[in-house]
Design a protein with these regions (language model features):
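Conserved, single-site charged/polar hotspot
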Residues: 1-234
Length: 234
């Protein structure tokens, strides 16, 4: 494997905060994308704003999957539905028709920094009651009404060094996320994939130490890289 991101066929969502006792649900990634967009934004917004927000939502989720953010902490899911940590997902809800159509078009497109391999950790908030370093959801509506394209909206909030990765390959779970929690002593192909990814990411973040032996064994060097990675992306 190249260590390049795949679009997962499915994603496992924890229906609560990370440490909260709550069920997990596994849904097709495209279904997840349509659900989050229907839960986070409004279908009546200008299409440029909807597209920009959906690209941020997709990239955020793919960053969680690609980096094994929760799996490397010993959890058995990829992402939560808590807006305190991740993005809103309402299990079983109906989705809006125009958003469903856009999800079918966009689910295998994401944003990343030029020269980086990992999908952008594209934080966002509503921009009215909550503000943050990332995109303002309501601010994106104003920019769309001012004639901004989805890409220009994204660069207004995340910086100009963005590129869209289109038609990313869809992979099985083996290509995308660890299937079980990873910890010191784990030895399997999931660990090997994690090692490849951490070494790729460390090209852009030199504070993350290189793992000298990509051998699928979760030993001290891998643990040190995971710890530094978690500090960087926390």
């Amino acid at each position: 494997p190249t260590g390049l991101p795949y679009i997962p066929e499915s994603i496992t969502v924890h229906l609560g905060r990370p440490d909260e006792s709550a069920p997990n649900v596994t849904v097709p990634f495209q279904t997840y994308v349509a659900n989050v967009a229907s839960s986070e934004i409004y279908p009546t917004w200008p299409e440029s704003a909807i597209r920009a927000n959906m690209l941020a939502q997709i990239s955020f989720a793919l960053n969680r999957v690609y980096t094994g953010y929760y799996r490397t902490r010993g959890y058995d899911f990829d992402i939560t539905n808590s807006t305190q940590y991740d993005q809103y997902f309402v299990n079983g809800r109906d989705v809006f028709e125009n958003i469903q159509q856009l999800a079918a078009e966009l689910f295998n497109t994401y944003i990343r920094r030029v020269g980086n391999v990992e999908p952008l950790f594209a934080q966002y908030c509503n921009g009215t009651t909550v503000t943050c370093n990332g995109m303002s959801q309501w601010g994106s509506v104003d920019l769309a009404r001012a004639g901004y394209t989805p890409y220009r909206i994204l660069t207004a909030y995340y910086g100009s060094d963005l590129e869209l990765v289109r038609n990313a390959p869809v992979g099985t779970v083996q290509n995308t996320a660890p299937t079980s929690p990873l910890r010191l002593g784990s030895a399997n192909n999931d660990v090997r994939l994690l090692q490849i990814r951490l070494n790729r990411i460390s090209n852009n973040y030199p504070n993350i130490p290189k793992i000298p032996y990509v051998n699928g064994i979760f030993a001290d060097a891998t643990e040190n890289a995971v710890r530094e990675f978690q500090k960087t992306f926390n």
